[in-house]
């Protein structure tokens, strides 16, 4: 039987570029372990250009990236308006895209728009699901309207931020808040704030990454929970995982970029999370409800905060969850008796299924014919 050809795309121009490479390595190994697919790899360099497959293989193997990119760019006609994606032609045709591009391009809907334009199946959520979920403010608005509990928040832009002094923030949200760039991932552009000076610095930092910033109340005594969700119309939910960092209970520590991707030796993981049956049921149901409300397909990770009274708050979705050796999403499915090879096989099947389902939708139109314009007085 002819193997389906899977185009694994990784890298990108976000701060999570290197994280994407590590995730892609694990996904590559998992796809290979199924013995069902031929894998073609495409790296997206930090300058936004797709690289040819041979160059991409070297980068996936963690060879020094910059000389590889420099050599490739010498072969590119940058005057070609399609130069950034021209390398996609280098491997012939393929059957499905498997994006592993965290942050910009991969999780904001950009790549999914390209896949749709090329009329190809792909793994994961559609453009609108990614775009809405990547915007923390839009996500919270949808969650709130649909009755899915999340933390209290304020949204500001560079102009309206002047109306929100630290004293006003404290009165509205409390004396510990998190300031977040609305469209960023993996704790980039996020600050924990406890005073006016930190507040000013945090706004300045977040506005480097987006012109829309979320100011969010802190949860007292928070435990952080993660839940994996996979599937389309009838999604599956994983066991719940929990993680804590030193001083998190007092509010001084939190699960930041360093803890996620650089050094999590001080992080305590718990799978399954030790929760009451009632809280476990509520968290899983909230995850499923949010998955559907946000129009997600294929895969996602839902992050929660559990307060000192064991009340869960949905933090945010991650539409292309990390799959590094440090990623809890990967471990959650292992514990849920779905190993890596089975997981990627299911994700690829979901991609084909969603593509076939969308093909049934009608995009027919009625021809306008000859224009007959009314009279103007």
Swiss-Prot record:
Cross-referenced PROSITE patterns: ATP_GRASP, DALA_DALA_LIGASE_1, DALA_DALA_LIGASE_2
Sites where the protein binds Mg(2+) 1: 303, 316
Gene Ontology BP, a term: peptidoglycan biosynthetic process
Pfam families for the chain: Dala_Dala_lig_C, Dala_Dala_lig_N
Pathway: Cell wall biogenesis; peptidoglycan biosynthesis
Lineage top rank: taxon: Bacteria
Family per similarity comment: Belongs to the D-alanine--D-alanine ligase family.
Protein name: D-alanine--D-alanine ligase
UniProt organism field: Leuconostoc mesenteroides
Organismal lineage: Bacteria, Bacillati, Bacillota, Bacilli, Lactobacillales
GN (gene name): ddl
């Amino acid at each position: 039987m002819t193997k389906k050809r899977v185009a694994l795309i990784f890298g990108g121009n976000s701060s999570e570029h290197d994280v994407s490479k590590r995730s892609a390595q694990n996904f590559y190994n998992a796809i290979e372990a199924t013995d069902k697919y031929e894998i073609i790899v495409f790296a997206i360099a930090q300058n936004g250009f797709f690289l040819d497959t041979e160059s991409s293989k070297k980068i996936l193997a963690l060879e020094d990236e910059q000389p590889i990119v420099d050599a490739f760019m010498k072969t590119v006609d940058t005057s070609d308006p399609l130069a950034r994606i021209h390398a996609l032609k280098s491997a012939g045709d393929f059957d499905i895209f498997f994006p592993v591009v965290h942050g910009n391009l991969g999780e904001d809907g950009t790549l999914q728009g390209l896949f749709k334009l090329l009329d190809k199946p792909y793994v994961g959520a559609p453009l609108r699901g990614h775009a809405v979920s990547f915007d923390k403010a839009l996500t919270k608005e949808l969650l709130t309207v649909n009755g899915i509990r999340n933390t209290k928040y304020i949204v500001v832009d560079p102009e309206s931020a002047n109306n929100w002094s630290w004293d006003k923030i404290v009165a509205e949200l409390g004396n510990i808040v998190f300031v977040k760039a609305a469209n960023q991932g993996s704790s980039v552009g996020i600050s924990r704030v406890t005073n006016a000076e930190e507040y000013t610095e945090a706004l300045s930092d977040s506005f480097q990454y987006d012109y829309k910033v979320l100011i969010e109340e802190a949860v007292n005594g928070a435990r952080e929970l993660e839940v994996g969700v996979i599937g389309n119309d009838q999604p599956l939910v994983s066991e719940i995982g929990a993680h804590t960092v030193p001083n998190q209970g007092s509010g001084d520590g939190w699960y930041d970029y360093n803890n996620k991707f650089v050094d999590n030796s001080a992080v305590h993981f718990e799978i399954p999370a030790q929760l009451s049956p009632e809280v476990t049921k509520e968290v899983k149901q909230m995850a499923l409800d949010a998955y559907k409300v946000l129009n997600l397909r294929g895969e996602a990770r839902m992050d929660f905060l559990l307060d000192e009274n064991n009340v869960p708050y949905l933090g945010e979705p991650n539409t292309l969850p990390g799959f590094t050796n440090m990623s809890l999403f990967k471990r959650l499915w292992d514990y849920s008796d779905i190993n890596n090879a089975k997981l990627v096989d299911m994700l690829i099947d979901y991609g084909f299924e969603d593509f076939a389902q969308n093909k049934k939708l009608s995009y027919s139109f009625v021809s306008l014919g000859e224009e007959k314009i009314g009279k103007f007085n």
